[in-house]
């Protein structure tokens, strides 16, 4: 006769999985942008390079909300999380935690940061609000997704909620991989793939701290 695992047993199993490096908890990321006038050329290039050649890219439309937990009289949030929901499918809500980029080796070709994605119920926003989280901003992302092995490429536009007009005349291009800790060889694979997209788009590590220091 089988019995359900106790909470402590579940925690132990999770810790064992983390120690065994089988949980994809690190995101390797490169980002860039491309003007509307050149986007079709990039999509054509990606169709030829990526795995879903026959079926074409996967279109998506996601609603995303950023919430933060702050301490009174402190400017820096204690924690920031994101809640995402695909608008055109019955997929569950996604709760996502994104950590600060690792300093690490400056010669590393990609940005690396902790990332955890959890499927959850539609009540997740109410739950976070009860915990003290507050909404910082929200937006809609619409675009196309390609796959190349473990790599994911998205070409998307950002819209304000309840607006049909994009916030800019360019597309955001992201190349990312979710992987367990310590698989830095992925970064080299991403660099090689990004080179194949030049000169249409320049994918690079983005220094978010530099943006935060801008007046």
UniProtKB/Swiss-Prot annotation:
Its main location: nucleus. GO terms for cellular component: core mediator complex; mediator complex. One of its GO terms (molecular function) is transcription coregulator activity. Transmembrane segments: none annotated. It is found in: Nucleus. Pfam families: Med18. GO terms for biological process: regulation of transcription by RNA polymerase II; termination of RNA polymerase II transcription. Keywords: Activator, Nucleus, Transcription, Transcription regulation. Component of the Mediator complex. Component of the Mediator complex, a coactivator involved in the regulated transcription of nearly all RNA polymerase II-dependent genes. Mediator functions as a bridge to convey information from gene-specific regulatory proteins to the basal RNA polymerase II transcription machinery. Mediator is recruited to promoters by direct interactions with regulatory proteins and serves as a scaffold for the assembly of a functional preinitiation complex with RNA polymerase II and the general transcription factors. Belongs to the Mediator complex subunit 18 family. This is Mediator of RNA polymerase II transcription subunit 18. The gene is MED18.
